[in-house]
Structure formats: C-alpha cells, structure tokens
From Swiss-Prot:
It comes from Shewanella oneidensis (strain ATCC 700550 / JCM 31522 / CIP 106686 / LMG 19005 / NCIMB 14063 / MR-1). GTP 1 binds at residues 9-16, 56-60, 118-121. GTP 2 binds at residues 205-212, 252-256, 317-320. GO terms for biological process: ribosome biogenesis. The gene is der. The lineage of its organism: Bacteria, Pseudomonadati, Pseudomonadota, Gammaproteobacteria, Alteromonadales. Associates with the 50S ribosomal subunit. HAMAP family: GTPase_Der. This is GTPase Der. Belongs to the TRAFAC class TrmE-Era-EngA-EngB-Septin-like GTPase superfamily. EngA (Der) GTPase family. SUPFAM superfamilies: P-loop containing nucleoside triphosphate hydrolases (SSF52540).
Length: 487
C-alpha cells in the first residue's frame, strides 16, 4: 500500500511550501485542469523513486483548546492514519509553546515522527536547531523547503522502511523517476494483467452524501454497522461481488462509522482512507449531494482522482424530492464547474430508492474498458499524423517540431508516448490539442488520457562541428581583420 506522509506544525512554519514542492508535477496536462481548486490539502508525490501521498494537515494551532476544536478534528484523524509524520518547526523563530504542545500530542500517539527544522537558509543552522532536541522526538532534520535543501534526503530517510515494498534499491542520490510509463511490450503485458482482474470500484465523496446507502443498494443487502474499535479505522473494506457475469471489488470508504446517539449513525469521514482507496481502484465513483451542489471538497477529491489517472463516473445523489427549479440550477452548476471533465458520465440517482443506480454500472464498465483497451502502435501513429495534418506543430527557433511515431505507454490511465525531435519545446496548448485529438479519435470515455513526449536521439548533439580547410582559412582572415581594426 502506498505510504502516507502527514505534514504537521503550527501556522507559517512552511508546511504549504514543502507540500507544493513535493506535489509539483512535471506535466501540466496531468494536474492543470482549469476549474480545479488550487487550495489542495493532499496530493500524490514522486521523489527519488518513492511514490507516496502527502497530506498538509493544517488546523492545529498548538494550544490545548485548539487541539480539541472541531477545526482540528480532521487534522488529528490524518495524524492517526498517516504512516509517517513530519513535525515541522521554524528554525528562525525558535522553539515555541505551540511546538511543545503539538510535540506532547505526537509523543502520546507514538507515531513514526521526524522533527524538521525549516527555514535554515542564511542562519547558523546547528545553533538554531539545538533547542528542538528538547522535544524528545529524536533527531532534528535541517531543511530549507523554499530552496529545496534537505528535502530529498529527508524523504529518503523517512521512507526507507518502505523501499523494499516499492522495489527501490537505494544507490545514493537519484533523480525523480517518471511514473507508470512502460515500453510497448510492458504496456501490452500490463493490459493483459488488468483484463484478468476484477474491476476495483472506489465509492468516494464528502461526509453524508449517501456512500453507505449506495453501497447497500448495490450489494442488495443491509450492511452491518461497523463500530469504532482499535485497528478498524486504518483500512477501507473490500467487498467482492458479481454483476452480469463480471467480477467487481467494491472499496467501501464509509465502512467505519460511529454511533453518536441511540438512533443516529454518523459517518466518520477519513481523507486518508479515501485517498488510499483511490490509489488502489481502477474506477472511482464520486458521489455529489444534489441539495448542496458542487462543494470545494468535491473538487479536491475529483482533482486527486484525476491526478491518479483513475477512470471516473459521477453520481449526483438525492435527486428525488427536489423541485424542478433546483434541478435546473444544479445542472447549470455542474456544467459550469465540471465542464473540464466532459469525458466523465454524470448520473442523477437516488441511492435510497434505487432510481438510476442500475445505469451506473453501464458507465463504470464503459470507463474501465476505455481505460484498459489496447491500441496498436500503427493506430496511435496514424492518429498522431492526422493531428499534425489538421494542425501543424509550431516552429521552434525557426525549425518545425517533428513528431515521428507513437505507442502505448500504459493503461488505467491510457498513456500515449510520442517520440520526435524538439518535442520538449512543444507549448502546452499544442499538447492539449493533441490530447483532445487522441481522445476524440479513440472515443475514450470516462477516463483521463495522458501524453508523454520523448526526445529523439540527436547524433550531432554535444559535438563540435569540424571546419573544412577553406572555412578555416576564411575564419583566420576574419580574425586578423578584426585585430587590424582594433589597432
């Protein structure tokens, strides 16, 4: 299972700076979907061969009252469920009462914790960090997150216990690796492997949108409520099922619930459990509450699913019992705020009464089939050439970018690898045009599609051009001319 790293600390110690550095993406087409919220608190990270989820907990001010407030509840839950906690402090400001309070809480939880003294640039780091040893949480790691100093070493050290599970052999400093990109043969093997496995479906959404009700409706039985007991909060529940001859595994992120009153069951929402479920799924079913419309939390979950490359279906729940005026307003909001994912099917359902639930699986199968359908190299190359014929690549330094051929580089999500000359200099607008061209040509529905560009080898790169004898003579004459003029 992919490890989760939680960033903990009082405000203004650099959590967001480190979060942004860790979750940066090299391909704007993966993360830069217009319309997505920019204020993300969780994301996927790839660094030095490690893949992990990073969570900016926020919401903890270090005071005893603050830790017990509703605002801090989600942050504390994230700390509980994280595999590694990075406790960030400000080396310039020194040790504060808030730091001591947070450290006391972390010690009581016995989490794998690393103390990070941030903002060490321009100061005597050893002297500034000495007092943080008194927190009693072990070694203090120095970092300047804004400049990137110490970030890679910190992550490597913190995630070393997970290296074997990820198949990573540590051999000193490494650059970031490109995720999930295969050769043509490896991509074909991956596609065959996916075809033999059941479809993993993660049902996600913010609290109380009807995830549990929909899960029960799909399974056709009333699930037993699972109470909070030690050891039950870490993982989602995996439920195998068969429908119309096809095997599924439902990943139930709402499986753990707590009873607050005798007759009332309140769903316990866990961000980390949801993120892990998305990582492990083939298809994500995002539930939106029709009565509340598209919330920022919906967009955050949607963004994570897209960045993970998962096939996607959206269900607008509680559609029954609302008047036509509200329905029209909700549809208008969906068009406005979710227009950037026009490839995903949207269904209007009632999980409670079962209205529209049956049609969900048609879209789930369609999305999965699109995400895992094999496409030949000849077909992909032909589509690439057609896109060039319709709209030529721009000139770069007076030369036309030349695209040579394309092949499959992975599935779920579908990855198309395009080889050519100067492809690294293609503007994002042309890359986005090509991505949409491939989507239309392949009739891809319900899944994001990713393009990777690989530069062709240039045999003349880094070679000094050797002059002919006549060119050498002209060069000498020109140089002597210049010297005479200076005299």
């Amino acid at each position: 299972m992919i490890p989760v790293v939680a960033l903990v600390g009082r405000p203004n110690v650099g959590k967001s700076t480190l979060f942004n550095r860790l979750t940066r993406t090299r391909d704007a087409l993966v993360a830069d979907f217009p319309g997505l919220t920019r204020d993300r608190k969780y994301g996927r990270a790839f660094l030095s061969g490690y893949e992990f989820i990073v969570v900016d907990t926020g919401g903890i001010d270090g005071t005893e009252e603050g830790i017990e407030t509703k605002m801090a509840e989600q942050s504390l839950a994230a700390i509980e469920e994280a595999d590694v906690v990075l406790f960030m402090t400000d080396a310039r400001a020194g040790l504060t009462a808030a730091d001591l309070s947070i450290a006391q809480h972390l010690r009581s939880r016995q989490k794998t914790t690393f103390v990070v003294a941030n903002k060490i640039d321009g100061i005597d780091a050893d002297s500034a960090c000495a007092e943080f040893w008194s927190l009693g949480l072990g070694e203090v790691y120095q970092m300047a997150a804004a400049q990137g100093r110490g970030v890679t070493n910190m992550i490597e050290y913190a995630l070393t216990p997970y290296a074997e599970a990820m198949g990573i052999e540590r051999q000193g400093e490494e650059e970031e690796v490109d995720e999930r990109q295969y050769t043509e043969e490896e991509a074909e093997a991956e596609q065959k492997r996916l075809q033999d496995l059941p479809i993993k479906l993660a049902i996600i959404g913010k609290p109380n949108v009807g995830k549990s009700t929909l899960t029960n409706r799909i399974l056709g039985e009333e699930r037993v409520v699972v109470y909070d007991e030690p050891g039950t909060t870490r993982d989602s529940i995996y439920i195998p099922m068969e429908r119309d001859g096809r095997e599924y595994v439902i990943i139930d992120t709402a499986g753990v619930r707590r009873r607050s009153k005798v007759h009332e069951v309140i769903e316990k929402f866990s961000v980390i459990k949801t993120l892990k479920a998305v990582e492990d799924a083939n298809v994500v079913l995002l539930i939106i509450d029709a009565r509340e419309g598209v919330a920022e939390q919906d967009l955050g979950l949607l963004g994570f699913a897209l960045n993970a490359g998962r096939a996607l279906v959206i269900a607008v729940n509680k559609w029954d019992g609302i008047d036509q005026g509200i329905k029209d307003r909700v549809k208008s909001e969906l068009d406005r705020r979710l227009g950037f994912i026009d490839f995903a099917r949207i269904h209007f359902i009632s999980a409670l009464h079962g209205t529209g639930v049956g049609h969900l699986f048609e879209s789930i199968e369609e999305a999965y089939d699109s995400a895992t359908r094999r496409v030949s190299t000849s077909m992909l190359t032909r589509i690439m050439q057609m896109s060039q014929d319709d709209h030529q690549p721009p000139l770069v330094n007076g030369r036309r970018v030349k695209l040579k051929y394309a092949h499959a580089g992975g599935y779920n999500p579908p990855i198309v690898v395009i080889h050519g000359n100067q492809v690294s200099k293609l503007p994002d607008s042309y890359k986005r045009y090509m991505m949409n061209y491939f989507r239309r040509s392949l009739k891809v529905v319900g899944t994001p599609i990713q393009l990777r560009f690989q530069e062709g080898d240039n045999p003349f790169e880094n070679k000094v051009e050797k002059l002919t004898m006549s060119q050498e003579r002209r060069r000498k004459r020109a140089l002597s001319h210049i010297k005479d003029r200076k005299k």
